[in-house]
A protein has these predicted regions:
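Aromatic, loop-rich ligand-recognition surfaces of beta-strand-rich domains
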Residues: 91-154, 170-219
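Solvent-exposed, conformationally flexible loop/turn segments
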Residues: 1, 19-20, 79, 169
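Short stretches within intrinsically disordered, low-complexity N-terminal or propeptide regions
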Residues: 4, 28-30, 41, 78, ...
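Short, surface-exposed linear segments at secondary-structure transitions and domain or protein termini
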Residues: 12-19, 46-51, 68-71, 96, ...
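Solvent-exposed serine/threonine-rich low-complexity stretches and specific carbohydrate-binding patches
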Residues: 157-166
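Predominantly extracellular/luminal regions of secreted and cell-surface proteins
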Residues: 47-91
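Serine/threonine-rich, repeat-prone extracellular segments and beta-strand-based repeat modules
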Residues: 2-43
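Extracellular interdomain linker/stem segments of modular secreted and single-pass surface proteins
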Residues: 42-49, 215-217
Length: 219
């Protein structure tokens, strides 16, 4: 069999903006003769489903709080467990991260950053916030910001829809839905609850897990 080069007519992205069939015309040089040819392209909308969490595959997990003011266990938010222990033995709670010490020092904000070895395509994020009888309080609605980056320097804020779930075992899920996006770095900007705790302690924020769920596409 022989193959011949084809010169295709110019096409624009607008021709593929809607589902359907697009015909592209061109000409092939067949042994010196210009032969008209055409190709039919089927255009479909990608169907997105939300897959499993890739939080546990994070390469670097960091927080903005200086080492001397860090509280509880940062790695707990990627261990796959959303529950919080009573931690009756004292010391750092191994099942949650918090900004307790930093908050008591007067800082109401904190950041947590995920860095991956390769780009991730995300479709949903679920943050599991925790509460206790002392300082831990659920954040106010609409105060958590999520930013994404490919290089860790230039950041874009995600436009999200926040849904606050029901409390179970002192943990409440905050689900963030958004248009599927790619990122190598994901940053969370956290702000403590505004209301007083009524306990003498300043409010702080605690997390048992952050689920970064992949977006899976199919046609």
């Amino acid at each position: 069999t022989a193959s011949f080069g084809v010169n295709w007519d110019d096409i624009s992205a607008d021709q593929f903006a809607e589902e359907g069939t697009v015909t592209v015309n061109g000409t092939a040089d067949v042994l010196g003769d210009e032969i008209p040819v055409s190709a039919t392209i089927r255009v479909q909308t990608e169907q997105i489903t939300v897959g499993s969490s890739v939080s546990g595959k994070v390469m670097n997990l960091t927080q903005s709080i200086p080492e001397g003011e860090q509280s509880d266990t940062l790695s707990a938010i990627v261990d796959g467990s959303t529950t919080i222990s009573d931690n009756t033995s004292g010391g750092a709670n191994p099942t949650a991260w918090s900004n307790w010490q930093s908050s008591q020092n007067g800082n109401s904000k904190a950041e947590i950053t995920f860095e991956y070895a390769t780009q991730q395509r995300l479709g949903q994020i679920v943050m599991h916030f925790a509460k206790d009888s002392g300082s831990m309080r659920y954040p106010d609605a609409g105060t958590t910001e999520i930013l994404v980056s490919e290089d860790g320097t230039n950041w874009n804020k995600l436009a999200v829809t926040e849904t606050i779930g029901e409390e179970s075992g002192r943990v409440k899920p905050y689900t963030y839905d958004f248009t599927p996006t790619t990122a190598t770095f994901i940053k969370f900007k956290l702000t403590n609850a505004s209301a007083s705790t009524g306990t003498g302690w300043k409010p702080c924020t605690a997390l048992t897990e952050i689920e970064l769920k992949v977006a899976q596409g199919s046609f």
